């Protein structure tokens, strides 16, 4: 220990510093990593702070520069000084170098290295507090603030100068004006010059705190007036705040006036003499020395010489005699001694015992004095009293002060005197942080935010924060860390206990509850095994207990009011605390003795408290600052920091947490080891919640098995053990081969039953063995809920897609249909009550949802339990069997409700939630989550406790229980909970209840047997089921009858069940609409007799009576798939015999015997109705009894050539290991080897490398430029501008949030745009039919009654003779008479609700109140609501939906399903067209175009042909969809989008952006039908072949980059063009047609809308478009659009999802994962999309080229010309080219065949070239023989084969043979279309196109033309770039002539060149380069 002796005389005092026996370099000074050393290990001089490589500082991670400065300053280099130099302390005013040397402080940071190691010039910005990283407060030696604290709106400097000259903020004016106008509080003094505020205690304290020193001038004048009574006014005007500072031996006044006349300091026993006038204190040697030293001479009197004198005086041993002026000779003991009471001697005074403020830490008595000693880790300062913390081997270390402000944790380094303290933020963006602690490695804090109560642990810099625990916390106000065991102790103000947790938060235990009321602050003393706390509750006290919770007792309980902060000075063994009401700092010994007040009168509202060395530090709410003073006297009061309201204060230094042996070092506790007082053993073992100690007092045993919570995250299953007190963590996690959409716990075997809606299966997973097996894999739709009946061992599920509830017996694995909902209701929630024998189901209807009760067997009535006040979105159920309670979440209304399921009565459990979703009951706690968030909430099921939260997986979230993984969080996270296995018995448990298939419970003691679909009961006991082969109707009593016995009026069954439910349904007559024997024209405005239907005469104005007549049966006047009613009406056969009267005369429900009466190609349901044959076994229930999805349906698995993804889809093997995530879960890219050809390919730094093809390097600017350049569009991935349809796009464009977070009152977007325009977002809700009678401003929901006092009650409770309103306003005298008038007539036409104010009328469904509020009017739902997918017929009080000829109504009676089932979805992606099918989900490559980009495609389904274009190649291809073989190819300039006229087979192609060409692959030619002029261009086109219409979008580019859009319609021959729509500031990108309803759909990217416009014939096209979708994420960058079965399918560039949106009803959108980012076109491959005609005009026409549908039948075309029928087209006018290897065929034989053709054709070309040369030579010879001397040969060479790989070489060869040399432009050749225009296309692409036949090639190469002179020998050669004169002139060989020969030169036979422009006659240009040749082609001619 370090010690100092105090001896009697100052001259004899000696200072003795003993060898230190303490920890050397026990911890390096940091906040993240400390190195420990045992005290006995000695010190090390190799490093000043231990292992500095591991030293880190608690600096906010954003300020790296600050961190580095501090780190360098602390670590520096290794010590190079002499041994022991580190212990050297420099004098005041000196700087200590790192090598131990000392220099003057003034030389530090003066630009010169004065230290030998130049350490005085390091970290000067930090040391001198220089910008830009630091800001010095104005006070001398004031705080040094981190730059981040400047201008943060908070005065962190005491004078507020850190907030001066800041940018304008709300509430502040620029500059310091706002501060000058500030007013100081009553606790502050305002400086005169800058009007800053300082604490009033600093006024006139002898130290200037104002920059103008006005606090020591004017302040002193004020102090004379305001000096409190408990203070002392000095002679100089200063005010001492405490009288205790008077006569304490210290000159506090500065003029010595506080130390004058102090008897206690000037006593003879202390060797002093006080003059009589009390002005002077003399030493005894100055008394009676013959010289008067007192001014009054009182030190020299006659008694100084009196007798007896000292020579005669006998003194005690050790005493000395002095002559005294008042008494003569007296004996005095030396200083440090006093006269013994009973002995005549001087005895030693024990100063340490009598005065405990002599030494900073330890005090040892010595003979005649004392000496101060310091504990390990401290050195004695030069005052021989103060202990300073050090670490041996280095310089003094900086202690760290932490304080909390609720929102932040701040840090301050405490420095020596006259050095600034550095202040910075440790952790920010917090909420209600109160307590804080630090153990040298981690920082801990408590959060008391409501519903976010937690204890958090983080690194020293605030990073990597993790929540240790939330469970069991209510208000954890403070915490302390036991640095020996790392246990965390904390107080809980609401739970009223002191508790402890292990450092990981997993094991927690309550320690002290007795006499604990409102505990606040906490301090621990591990070496003594003690803890102390403050309690400000009913009995305020300072409490003490052993750290294991034993021996709890108060040590202070009197004269204490509001004790807050507590601190332990373990060196002096004293406890300090602050009392907020008394405004004091007090101290007491650990045993409750020695209580005294340190400081009072100067504290306003102290809260936190800490101690370090001789200083106390506390926070004060009133002054919003951290204060400090001396721990003994309370002097040296100062403010260290200002901030918001400051709570806890904590100081860390390694010396404050000394290491020492302890009882837990060798303990063998299984869970918790707690220190205790040595006298009771030093430690004890403790157990967490739910466990107890075993008899050996070491092990913990479970009292009951903990229940577990299961969480489904995609394919990951998390298992969490729930604890009521402690940390939740993932105990286990499993990766499953399925998606977890719904799950339920099987309490019988502990397995989880999971529904996967992607793979459409239900499987069982056993967590113990990790095994899974499939329970159900066929006939599944979208499973919305699972429920498990533990009594009968049955699994129930709800299927929204198939609208059924089904059951599966886990004993027999048979399934049965419980209930089918054929209307518009679908089950979305489900739970079972096995002991009651029924289940609760949530049914979602069109207009509302309701909760019903159904028997578990499905046999019995369906009771509506909860009808009102339910939302229309997700509703999930969970049951608490212990309390007979059902809970349900309502995501639409944002609340959780509950009810007793035996006595239903709905009550709200929790409201104002953000879309609650899944529920789970774990023990006594209810868990739930919210849509779109990765958080799980829970609270006690009694709803008495706070809401707790578990963050599953969130980036930078301390509450996350598993590491953040950058994957999308599922929108809805399913939950399930384990539950203990019950011992209940049930009949179904014994041999399956005697049932052959399925046993279902009917309560706890009864059961019933069910049969699977297609089975019937065999016996009368209904126990055994057999396959229904001949039993058409099974009586309830067991008999088997034929269907003609059903409802025949006779009793054929014993129980008469054959005649049950046979009454006709009441049906209101319709309004004056079309009669049943009339046909309703599709326009809805005309009726014609059915006799005129399909009579080849157009009677309807819209011609609909003559449409779709191919399958119209004139005998029954209905289509073949329809039933002809007796009244003449037609209904779809799918609605026959389904129990609903669709005909109106019930004729569709008569004669329902199961005889073979369905039309061919139809399937007969078990009920008797007929559906399309393709609907059988298609995975969707279409029969009302579900019989179409029977057990014989083959399970569809992946074909052999496909691979199954982990998510269950089937994937084309060609897409496996292609570098792209095609599965969506990346399972197709697992275990892929490295491609050696690409492994070493890298791009330049300024380039972007495509991941789908590493060989492609693009400029870096392609990244996120809005277009896709890579083959799979990965250059547009993660660009932040495309959000999912379930997300909202923030206005910034860089952020997406969940759509349900829009307008929820919380800003989730960084720019807050999600909370803008929320009133418009909410819109106007549909008005209820019940009008509220209240006029109160407080509005209740429509179905609620306003009590006019802010309360709302259900209308059903009004006028029920019981006052439900608190004020009784729901009952009144009018309740009995309100619904009838005085005459007795009913007031309301339909329904009446009596209220105290009168009648409230309402109407039946389908009606609305008239203006008189009494009568009801029919609603035209067809017009107002558009509820039907296709055709809608309004009826009284309702409507009926119908379908077009190729469709039939589904069981929902709203949507239409194609008779040709099995449609798939095709979409293009760069060079591929992919095919996505649904049952099962399969993705394969329909066809591939090698490396060429596919720019458009379409299908002709009935012909089974596909068509696609390749713009770069200039070719349109026809491909056989069955064989995937190219049939034919046509050459066109720059073809992009195309659309098929499926009637004739013609293809309409957008060519060159300004032309539309019609192409016939039969006629092998194309012709232009539309041409637009610049600056307009055609963007997209669509064809309706049935109605012979073409539609196209024209974009006009206007000024400043703005665009306008036009939609044009024309006949298919290009005639009768009409503009349907024109819109400015628009950019339409795609359109498609619905030929059945004659609707044109289009998307506008600029307006983000999907719209439609009718082109049905009327008086003209309807020109007003209807918006179907607007501002939806389904329309971010739409590039492709298709419509099928009244659903729109959309693809967006940059999105990996296609979108399917219903175009009727609610228009809900769903996503379809396609996993490519660059899909451009999308087409539904369904036959019904293209209705067929029985015949078409072109089938009988005689056109030799093109035959196009036209207004009057057809038109013939040759190229661009209309020609007469029969006229032949000239040779060479076709467009056909041959294709080699253009498309990837899956058949290798085809590839070999193509390669063989290529080599054969190349050989023919070589022969042709040779023949050509020979022929030309022969011609030239004949020509010369006839006497001609010049060569006049014109060659016209057309090149439709521009994409041939060897074309360029071929052309160069031909030019060489012709003697002509010219150069083509870079890598391109030109092709000429039939419209005489040119386009330049790539000649180096992998597409290889070639002349179709050699004769054709020769004919095209040498085509005779007539010259001006009529010379038949003239030939013409078409050249590239004919308009470029320089290049053409180069053909002349560069020769020049001046003799009039046109520049040819004399005697040279070089051809002249003639150029003719596109629109000019060549003759007009004659002589330009020579020659005189007429022509009209845009070409260049060689003229010899």
Curated annotation (Swiss-Prot):
GO terms under cellular component: cell cortex; clathrin-coated vesicle membrane; coated vesicle; cytoplasmic vesicle; early endosome membrane; plasma membrane
Cytoplasmic side: 1821-1984
Annotated site residues (Critical for endocytosis) in this chain: 1837, 1878, 1892
Phenotypic effect of disruption: Disruption of vitellogenesis resulting in failure of oocytes to take up yolk proteins and form yolk granules. Oocytes complete oogenesis without morphological abnormalities but eggs are shrivelled and do not hatch.
Residues in EGF-like domain copies: 306-343, 348-388, 1418-1453
Entry-annotated residues carrying Phosphoserine: 1926
Topological relation to the membrane, as annotated: Single-pass membrane protein
This protein's name: Vitellogenin receptor Yl
Gene from which the chain derives: yl
